[in-house]
A protein has these predicted regions:
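A short, charged helix-loop
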Residues: 125-154, 192-203
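Glycine-rich, often acidic, oxyanion-interacting loops/wings at catalytic, nucleic-acid
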Residues: 154-236
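Short helix-capping/linker segments at secondary-structure and domain boundaries
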Residues: 131-136, 169-170, 255-259, 305-315, ...
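Low-complexity, acidic/Ser/Thr- and charged residue-rich accessory regions of DNA metabolism proteins
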Residues: 281, 321-367
Length: 367
């Protein structure tokens, strides 16, 4: 098993082995396996074999990288996207290092069934080395949003979390009503629905439901406030069916439409491209990859269904209207394939529209 060397403090530039003086190469590549309590770091100088992994306290790592940069080393860092966000990447870039955040993936390339933090850091370090040397397929690099973009995303993501919480409490209340043979309206906690229910419910059941009502009322108010804030930020003169809320969610999840070079990159980011199994002369398309942004994918499918109602002349919808127009009467598989195809083409058309390649009317959208 690979030995882990503990690095407990950041030494001064004149320190002994284990500090920046232990490196003699011009280029240093660092693979990070990040945890809340520590960072496990594997380092490689130039083209040499990676050194044994070290552990750093989170507060020690960036200053240590700073000492390497101060000595004239060129430092490259890579770590997988995780729940700790992009703050570390921004701090490293501000210090002068080149930092890449990549999509998570299985790092046990040999499939030995052995997983340690040191091994993961070592694999990341070696992949980074090959990437820096020119093999761009070694890392799936993620675009790091700016702090402003990340703050803007939190608004609709917080609203999404509140909607989920409200749906859960609403369902619990309805379940309690149905369990005891009572009518269960969808908005049972609101003033009008509650007045009708309270008159016919037994007292003990009203007491149980009253526990939910204040929480649901607060959630209603918070969701309404966030919805108004988001709709206020929407672009003016949107085509019919493209709601203000959906437009803001899609724009903020993408952040920058200009980063896509072609329609293939757009489709890949949505995760709505079909998988494929091909060998010899056989080609078998599979289910969509779902590789990409799940919130964007959900918003696109929701918007695609609205276009079936409000923009039936939109070319991707018109092409599949025979299936989509049947609604629930169509088979589940046919409806799903059709709406996914519409959502995929819709993402490409939104990219063309937002990057100024063509007008919305030319794409088939009606005002």
């Amino acid at each position: 098993m690979q030995k882990i060397i503990l690095h407990r403090a950041v030494a001064a530039p004149t320190g002994a082995a284990g500090t920046d003086r232990s490196f003699s190469g011009t280029t240093i590549k660092l693979g990070l396996d990040i945890h809340q309590a520590c960072y496990v770091v594997a380092a490689q100088e130039d083209h040499a074999t990676p050194k044994p992994a070290r552990r750093f306290a989170p507060a020690e790592f960036v200053p240590w990288v700073g000492t390497l940069l101060a000595r004239g080393h060129q430092v490259f860092v890579v770590y997988e996207a995780c729940g700790f966000g992009f703050g570390l990447c921004r701090r490293l870039q501000a210090a002068g290092a080149t930092c890449y955040v990549i999509a998570p993936r299985k790092l046990d390339e040999a499939r030995k069934g052995v997983k340690t933090d040191a091994l993961d850091a070592g694999v990341l370090c070696q992949r980074l080395s090959r990437y820096v040397e020119g093999n761009r397929k070694e890392l799936a690099v993620i675009r790091v949003p700016s702090e402003e973009e990340e703050r803007a995303r939190h608004v609709h993501r917080q609203r999404e979390a509140l909607v989920r919480a409200r749906t859960k409490l609403q369902a619990q209340g309805r379940g309690l009503l149905l369990t005891h043979g009572q009518p269960a309206p969808a908005r049972w906690w609101r003033k009008q629905g509650w007045a009708a229910l309270e008159a016919r419910l037994p007292g003990w059941l009203c007491v149980r439901l009253e526990v939910f009502r204040p929480v649901l009322a607060v959630l209603d108010a918070q969701i309404a406030a966030l919805t108004a804030e988001l709709e206020k930020a929407a672009a003016p003169d949107l085509p019919s069916g493209l709601g203000k809320l959906t437009q803001v969610v899609i724009s903020r999840e993408v952040c920058d439409w200009q980063r896509f070079q072609n329609r293939r990159q757009v489709s890949s980011y949505t995760g709505l491209c079909p998988g494929e199994y091909s060998s010899g002369g056989k080609r078998v398309p599979g289910a969509v990859t779902k590789h990409g942004n799940p919130r964007l994918r959900c918003a696109l499918v929701e918007l695609a269904w609205r276009l079936v109602r409000f923009q039936p002349q939109y070319p991707p919808v018109a092409k599949r209207l025979a299936v989509l127009g049947q609604g629930a009467r169509a088979t589940g598989a046919a409806r799903k394939k059709a709406i996914v195809a519409v959502a995929r083409q819709l993402a490409v058309d939104l990219w063309r529209w937002q990057t100024g390649q063509c007008m919305a009317e030319k794409l088939g959208f009606q005002p």
